[in-house]
Amino acid sequence: MTQRKQSVVQGQHAGKRDYMRFTYCPHCGTKLVLKEIGDEGLIPFCEQCSIPLWDSFTTCIICAVTNEKHEVALLRQGYVSAASYVCVAGVMKPGEAAEEAAVREVGEELGLSVEKLTYIKSYPYDKKEMLMLGYHAEVKKEEFRLSGEVDAAEWVPFEGALEKLREGSIAWQLVKAVISGR
């Protein structure tokens, strides 16, 4: 076995994180082989179904929710972070568009209706094997109607928002981009 093929089999490829790799086809159960596919290199492949099975990661949304008074909604969710505030975030459901997920999560977590939604940027989150799609969700300032998964939420003026978030976190990067107008 070549060094390249061996490293791909072991999941230690090109310095990338070891994402979930398929061993058997989820459609027919056949053991996969490694097949060279264009510029992608060796990819797990089902010869029975004639399909490649790409590395998997979870796609999520994260929203900087703001109102007309230049405030951002910051949440406390103990299961996410005991020490820092966070933004609205959640996993996309099968068949759901990212924009639909963003609107749904703002409604579920804060009980607010999104008036305008703007895509900002994608953020790879290697530690949890996720891709976070960042949005700016604009709402009217109202009382929060929190879901059971949110411990608390508050409206924070733009000027003080970054200091309440963990510096460098995805929430911090997103809020910084939104309040700086990027």
Model-identified regions with their sequence ranges:
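NUDIX/MutT-family hydrolases
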Residues: 145-176
